[in-house]
Each structure stands twice: as structure tokens, then as C-alpha cells.
């Protein structure tokens, strides 16, 4: 919460839900909370970049310890995976990341992912965990990405949750209210930005809450939050990586003939 206290009931619920999902899904958990729980140990915390890095370094082991505690009754080991933006922008590093996660899944280990705030380059940081989760989902060719939010879903102008969105268009974008979480960096604008990216690459996205007893199961059956339908995509894995994980370093201008050849995949 805003005072830096981790809600054990939420962690317990997340662990229980994921334990059930593992029967049919390979799961990656991207978890916030490190900075929020670690800032209690930073005197006169003001939220500067250096203080956030220090708070994350203190909070990450606390968070992992709790996940270990609540996954333990299900005999499920967890792994801490601290990522940086270059792990996705570098194709070779990304492929190594995929191999490691494949090893996790083969051994029934749940990877718990967060940004490596302590050493992350300021210019190449993730904008927030919404971006990190989206890059994970796209890079690992996920079927579904569930993004949790305190408001329980994507709301219209009357603060009513919209249960189904077929496409993120100008009408949907018009409902976005600016503002960020008091605990993290992301807000609904960020969530919708990365939802649009994920759905454009063929991934179903659900923005939902954690208030029900079985929030993930409810989300997957359309009973919790807002479901954003995936758009048709014929892109191969490398093309999806180029569309999401790679970083633009420059531009090339081509003439009409070259453009036609590229569009025809020649």
C-alpha cells in the first residue's frame, strides 16, 4: 500500500491462483512492490532516482521471500529474474533469456520478474512494469497477458468497467483518464499503450483486478475486468521481436521501388 506495507493476502491469493494455472499454462509473474516495500528503510525518502534504486534493492529480496513463503505450500519453487531493457533489445541476450525461462518451465519453477533497478541505465529503462510484461508476453509468444490494476478494469466515462474491447481505437483512447499509481510508475494510459501493442501482435490482454477470490480464473473466463481481443497477426517470432523489443537507432529512406519490393517481401 501507500505506506509500503505488503498485503500478504494478495500474495497468498496470487500464489494460489498461479498454482492452479500451472496445470494448463506456463506462467511468468511480473510483480511490482519492490520500491514500495523498500522505501521504508530509506530515511527521509523523497522518491529521487537514486532513492528508488536503493529502495528496490532492499525491497526485492523481501518480496521474493514472501512469494517463496506462499508458493511453498504448493511445493512450487520460485526464481527471481531481474531484467534490463537491453535483455530485450539485444537479440542474442533475448534468446538466452528465452532459454533460461524454458528451463524454469521444464522444472515447474515460477519466474518472478522485475526490472533490475539498481543498475538499469537511465536512458534505457523500462517505462514501467506494463512495458516489461508486454515485452515478456510478445517475446515468449504468449496467448494471454493479464495486467492487474486497482480499479478492476478499463472504465468508460461513467466509471463502469467495459467487459470487452474488440480493438483499441480512438473511441477507447478517449476514455483514458491520466494519472499514475501512487505505488508505481504506470497508469491506465501506459496499460492501454502496451495493450494496443500486445493485441496488434496477436495476444489477448485482460486488464482486471484482484478483488475476487479467484481473479485470474475469473479474468480468463470473462468474469473479471476488461478483455481486449487479439488482432490477426502472421508475423514470425523475429518480426515480433523487431516490433516490440528492439530499439530504434536510426532510419532509412527508400524509394517507391524499394518500398514495393519490401512490402512484397522480396
Where on the chain are the PLM-derived regions?
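C-terminal catalytic "cap/lid" subdomain
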Residues: 1-77, 81-266
Amino acid at each position: 500500500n501507500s505506506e509500503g506495507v505488503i498485503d500478504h493476502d494478495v500474495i497468498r491469493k496470487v500464489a494460489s491462483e498461479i498454482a492452479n494455472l500451472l496445470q494448463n499454462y506456463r506462467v511468468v509473474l511480473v510483480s511490482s512492490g519492490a520500491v514500495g516495500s523498500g522505501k521504508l528503510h530509506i530515511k527521509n525518502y523523497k522518491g529521487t532516482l537514486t532513492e528508488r534504486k536503493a529502495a528496490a534493492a532492499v525491497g526485492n529480496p523481501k518480496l521474493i521471500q514472501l512469494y517463496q513463503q506462499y508458493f511453498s505450500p504448493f511445493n512450487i519453487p520460485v526464481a527471481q529474474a531481474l531484467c534490463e531493457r537491453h535483455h530485450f533489445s539485444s537479440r542474442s541476450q533475448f534468446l538466452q533469456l528465452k532459454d533460461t525461462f524454458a528451463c524454469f518451465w521444464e522444472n515447474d519453477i515460477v519466474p518472478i520478474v522485475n526490472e533490475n533497478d539498481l543498475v538499469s541505465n537511465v536512458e534505457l529503462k523500462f517505462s514501467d512494469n506494463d512495458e516489461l510484461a508486454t515485452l515478456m508476453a510478445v517475446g515468449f509468444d504468449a496467448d494471454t497477458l493479464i495486467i492487474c490494476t486497482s480499479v478492476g478494469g478499463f472504465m468508460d466515462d461513467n466509471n463502469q468497467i467495459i467487459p470487452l474491447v474488440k480493438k483499441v481505437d480512438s473511441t477507447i483512447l478517449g476514455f483514458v483518464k491520466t494519472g499514475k499509481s501512487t505505488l508505481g510508475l504506470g497508469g491506465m494510459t501506459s496499460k492501454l499503450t502496451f495493450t494496443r501493442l500486445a493485441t496488434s501482435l496477436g495476444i489477448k490482454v485482460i486488464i482486471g483486478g484482484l478483488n475476487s477470490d479467484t481473479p485470474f480464473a475469473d479474468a480468463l473466463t470473462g468474469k473479471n475486468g476488461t478483455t481486449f481481443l487479439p488482432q490477426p497477426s502472421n508475423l514470425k517470432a523475429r518480426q515480433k521481436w523487431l516490433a516490440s523489443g528492439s530499439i530504434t537507432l536510426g532510419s532509412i529512406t527508400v524509394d517507391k521501388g524499394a518500398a514495393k519490393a519490401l512490402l512484397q517481401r522480396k
